[in-house]
């Protein structure tokens, strides 16, 4: 053998060390070297999160969720250089309180359907954001929904080299008692919907982050109807009468089969597809707006006397808004899914 001869060892048990020797010939082992090296089989190509190989597929996914706090931090450890697909969804914005606009969906970034990204062996940071709290009742300042929290993979800050960084959804606007200037929906991954009450005030929806979502809808320029929160697949609907507007649709992402998503409780499964980042529905004096597919929370009407519905967990959906003096629903938490092919 020459100095650069290589070989592949197969059939090794995971996490078991093996001593390797070199012999001159399998038929004539007269010469056997001293110990050449010790090798061990890696138990996996990567570790971190919940590891799933969907039935019948030749790839593995690592699923990361928010388990507490504004952001849950985790480590994705690669045991070798491989190409990795990603789905990164931030937390959704909270719905606005007191005749509010729906919360904007968390920003969504996905490589599936395109080219997987080359990633180097080593430890890589993952963070998964929670949804923003719904707006309260009592003033325009407290009535605006809170923004959702960012999610990221392969880094923590938005300027880290190679990071995939999704911006939290914008909070929904509110009716603006005593301070009409605070009514608009907030900017975010997708924008929050504008609040609805005073016809003289600004009811515009919040703007979206480029490539991550869509704008929120405006509240009605009459009275008592908020705009829908933006979703990853479509803008929030503007209110046009005394009825609340629907949240923007989320986006179907085929990073796993629907059965895998349902079995591991992330995304919203509809018709065999898995949707993420739907906008929150708006509240109104009349009929309330529905949340967008992909975890958007429904709005409520004034007669129901309830808070807006929360966005779906691990979907990044925006929170729904109420049609009366009640609180907005919290945004749904985000999710990070990382996928790589198994060697042939």
Predicted regions and their residues:
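Surface-exposed, short loops/turns at beta-strand junctions within beta-sandwich domains
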Residues: 9-17, 116-120
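Low-complexity, glycine/proline-biased repetitive segments and flexible coils/loops
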Residues: 43-57, 64-344
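Extracellular fibronectin type III
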Residues: 14, 25-43
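Short linear Ser/Thr-Pro motifs
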Residues: 1, 25, 33-36, 151, ...
């Amino acid at each position: 053998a020459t100095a650069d001869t290589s070989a592949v060892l197969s059939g090794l048990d995971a996490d078991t060390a093996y001593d390797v020797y070199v012999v001159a010939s399998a038929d004539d082992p007269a010469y056997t070297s001293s110990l050449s090296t010790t090798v061990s089989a890696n138990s996996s190509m990567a570790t971190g999160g919940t590891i799933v190989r969907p039935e019948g597929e030749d790839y593995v996914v690592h699923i990361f969720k928010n388990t507490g706090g504004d952001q849950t931090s985790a480590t994705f450890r690669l045991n070798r250089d491989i190409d990795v697909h990603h789905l990164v969804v931030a937390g959704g914005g909270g719905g606005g309180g007191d005749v509010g606009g729906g919360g904007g969906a968390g920003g969504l970034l996905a490589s599936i359907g395109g080219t997987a990204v080359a990633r180097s062996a080593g430890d890589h940071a993952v963070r998964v954001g929670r949804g923003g709290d719904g707006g309260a009742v009592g003033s325009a300042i407290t009535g605006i929904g809170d923004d959702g929290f960012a999610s990221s993979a392969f880094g923590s800050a938005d300027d880290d080299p190679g990071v995939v960084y999704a911006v939290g959804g914008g909070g929904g606007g509110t009716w603006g008692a005593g301070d009409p200037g605070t009514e608009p929906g907030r900017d975010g991954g997708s924008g929050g919907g504008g609040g609805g009450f005073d016809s003289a005030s600004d009811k515009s929806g919040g703007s979206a982050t480029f490539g991550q979502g869509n704008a929120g809808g405006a509240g009605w320029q009459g009275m008592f109807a908020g705009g829908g929160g933006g979703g990853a697949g479509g803008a929030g609907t503007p209110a046009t009468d005394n009825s609340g507007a629907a949240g923007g649709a989320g986006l179907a992402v085929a990073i796993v089969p629907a059965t895998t998503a349902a079995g591991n409780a992330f995304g919203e499964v509809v018709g065999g597809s898995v949707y993420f980042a739907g906008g929150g529905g708006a509240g109104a004096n009349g009929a309330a707006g529905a949340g967008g597919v992909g975890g958007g929370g429904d709005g409520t009407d004034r007669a129901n006397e309830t808070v807006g519905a929360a966005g779906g967990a691990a979907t990044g959906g925006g929170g729904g808004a109420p049609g009366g003096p009640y609180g907005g629903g919290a945004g749904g938490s985000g999710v990070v899914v990382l996928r790589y092919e198994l060697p042939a």
